[in-house]
């Protein structure tokens, strides 16, 4: 059985169309169809249901594609490893990143990496964390940067950064604010930045809360922190962007929790308060278990950890021993 035919079958399954697969593979559709018929005859099994132009996998087909993709990945891993043993750092690296991490954390890291390895072509894949976890588990990207917890047991993790979770609240007094929160904000405005008071999470139990939508790892972090204090946040708004959440806070529409890296200290409408018990979130590199981790990926992970260790001091990183 030719591995090339496995690749043909996998592409048909991926695109659910012989026509689209043939276009992508740059071969004639009749030739592609004939190759698959020969494969099915060799196996004595039907791999694809063909009906009115649509193509779906049979149960036998699903199993075949699952194993075929494992074989293709193993072949690709072997070729990459042998190439790197011969030539050193490779030429391509694909990295999955959520939008916020990509916007705030990655630009300086990429600048340093490409300055050291200018020949490497880096492909950034920006998706929501749930999609990135699935893509990484399928081997569709070399690695991703996500926040704990990681649920897929097929994935390995390497810690990158632990940072505090802070509470963003309006600077101006709002009708919905409990007196103790108002007093805490007033005290914080009077203190130096390094001496600001901490807020108990329970203090925002009944205030309007701005949450990220489903599918964001940081949303899970916030819900877990609130659950540990015995309450579910009163969600006034849900958004896909942490910047939008902070803007809503600045306009007095509620409070939100945010990773320390995204705080907007120059925003005149928002003040950031430390939270009692020093909750944190941990960013990790995520990659597929039992798969060759390229020298290129290893180099990027090592440079990133070194760079962030120099950039963030102990106060920025928070409690390094506490994972969420």
From Swiss-Prot:
This is Uncharacterized HTH-type transcriptional regulator YcgK. Residues 18-37 bind DNA. One of its GO terms (biological process) is regulation of DNA-templated transcription. GO terms for cellular component: protein-DNA complex. Residues 1-58 form the HTH lysR-type domain. The keyword Transmembrane helix does not apply. PROSITE patterns: HTH_LYSR. Belongs to the LysR transcriptional regulatory family. InterPro entries: LysR_subst-bd (IPR005119), Tscrpt_reg_HTH_LysR (IPR000847), WH-like_DNA-bd_sf (IPR036388), WH_DNA-bd_sf (IPR036390). The lineage of its organism: Bacteria, Bacillati, Bacillota, Bacilli, Bacillales. Keywords: DNA-binding, Transcription, Transcription regulation.
